[in-house]
Amino acid sequence: MKAILTHPGSAHKDDFLACCLLIARYGLPVWRRDPEPGDLDDPGIIVVDVGGEHEPERGNFDHHQFPAEHEPVCSLSLVLQHLGLYEDARTFCEWLEPTEWFDSRGPFATADWLGIERSVVNRLNSPVDITLLRRFAQKRELEAGDPVWEVMRMVGEDLFMYLRTLRERLDYVAAHARVLEVGEGDETLKVLYMPRTDPMPDDPSSGLSRYIEQTGAEIDGLIYPDRRGPGFGLSRHADNERLDFTRIAGEEDVHFAHARGFVAKTTATDLGRLAELMVRAKV
């Protein structure tokens, strides 16, 4: 394969991220120019966000030719579909759907869809967005060794890794975690308990909230291995105010309780004791 080709001029988040994924997958240079005769027919050139054609088998990923009533999609959507990542990305990347709306419907329609004022959209910008898109737009060609190309490769690699490892993590949580009911009567709490396993993941609490969201379980709190020691972490789920861990700050086996009450750390490992601490933290 020869290159990734995208349009010159202003760059947007969708074409930038689409190119990031393609750079990470194929390691190709990027040409920023209008397609020349034959580019769309050349299987060695991946044409992104320009060219008026969506033909994945020929490496062409434009959405501008779609009718106005077409569901919101962008060049990033088309590349994710081609890579087999779209469904997971829509599930796990909350920023994707607003990106599709913004690129295909514009800022005012996107603000209406989000239920916010147009001015709020501008407040969500950062120098990271502005600088990366501006520097990308200034380039005619990018290749390995160029700082912008290397950053784009890292962005693409991280997105690939995030989607792959999160799916693996959710499967891991499903295989090991269980829901406990602790306390009695009206005082009962539903807690998702993640036991210590061997080997233990780098971040034992990773994926727990996503798993709860996917399963639809009603959960008040979480118990999970402390990655910094042999004990466990205790926390609220979705900032559930039924739990205030400052209430157990004085327990002998609790060595940390956040002043705002949303998380605590304990050296306890016995499940009965962990359940007791959750009950004592109940407001």
Predicted regions and their residues:
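Acidic catalytic cores of enzymes that act on phosphate-bearing nucleotides/polynucleotides
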Residues: V121-P201, A217
